[in-house]
Regions:
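Transmembrane helix segments
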Residues: 43-51, 163-204
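Alpha-helical transmembrane segments of multi-pass membrane transporters/translocases
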Residues: 33-37, 43-45, 119, 144, ...
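Hydrophobic alpha-helical transmembrane segments of multi-pass membrane transport proteins
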Residues: 59-127
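Membrane-interacting alpha-helical segments
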Residues: 10-13, 17-24, 28, 95, ...
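Aromatic- and glycine-rich beta-strand/loop motifs that create alpha-glucan
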Residues: 2-36, 88-89, 253
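Hydrophobic alpha-helical transmembrane segments of multi-pass membrane transport/permease proteins
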Residues: 22-50, 59-77, 116-118, 174-183, ...
Length: 254
């Protein structure tokens, strides 16, 4: 690596550490990804336990499906990290520093990814033994598949910010789209038993295929959907990052 490359890397790491630290200093984001998510799993699992032959099956369903919901909502964590008003002023200083604009959005993308991934993994470590939830015979595959999905979600949030230049607009659009896709994908309740038309409609939602991938891993110990989802999420992450390079404009911060 050249001297300039090493200097750019040190600058990036410095900015990344600051962004990563700021996320953990935000009690709302930490609480949403841990306490709120955990309570939602407990409440829905308890209330819907009677719908399953074994009450533990309800906890299995909602632990997996709501972790997926949390991963997708990582896009809003990233948008907050990127364009929250107080942070935006600091971003402006970085843009005109030798670090440049790329460090602004890519550091926040990677910081948001790690923040969400760590908290969601920690939540699984706590809830799985407590609720007798299985992540499959080899939980490493489950955790490994989470990584590109988490990164793609963070990249989506940053990409929307680069396109719409407004945190409020970005958060509203992301919240609406993610919630709609999750409802269609069966996050909160399965739509497969509501007729053939509704069952076909669910296949439109990418969340349906995320659910298939994670449930076949955790319940069937099958890697059938692992690589298709892993590769798709990785490619999507790269495309969204390139989209940020294309749409990011310094003047949007002035």
């Amino acid at each position: 690596m050249t001297e300039k490359g090493e200097l750019d890397m040190r600058r990036f790491i410095t900015i990344f550490k600051m962004d990563f630290s700021n996320l953990f200093k935000n009690p709302v984001l930490v609480g949403y990804n841990t306490a709120f998510a955990g309570l939602l799993i407990l409440i829905l699992g308890y209330l819907c336990g009677g719908d399953y032959a074994d009450s533990n099956t309800a906890y299995q369903y909602y632990t997996v499906s709501l972790i997926i919901y949390g991963m997708l909502n990582g896009a809003m964590t990233a948008s907050n990290c990127f364009m929250e008003r107080d942070i935006k002023r600091a971003n402006l200083r970085i843009i005109y520093s030798p670090a440049g604009g790329f460090s602004v959005y890519f550091s926040k993308m990677t910081a948001s990814f790690l923040f969400n991934y760590i908290l969601h993994s920690l939540l699984l470590v706590i809830l799985c033994p407590l609720l007798h939830v299985s992540l499959g015979s080899n939980p490493v595959f489950f955790l490994l598949l989470m990584a590109p999905v988490e990164f793609a979600s963070a990249a989506l949030g940053i990409f929307f910010c680069c396109v719409f230049h407004c945190e409020e607009t970005t958060s509203t659009l992301l919240s609406t789209v993610i919630s709609l896709l999750c409802v269609l994908g069966g996050t909160f309740f399965s739509l497969d038993g509501m007729g053939s038309l509704m069952a076909f409609t669910t296949k439109i939602s990418p969340v349906k295929w995320l659910n298939e991938a994670f449930f076949t891993l955790s319940c069937d110990n099958s890697l059938q959907y692992f690589w298709p989802v892993f590769i798709t999420a990785t490619v999507l992450s790269v495309l969204l990052t390139l989209g940020c390079v294309l749409f990011f404009r310094t003047e949007d911060y002035i």
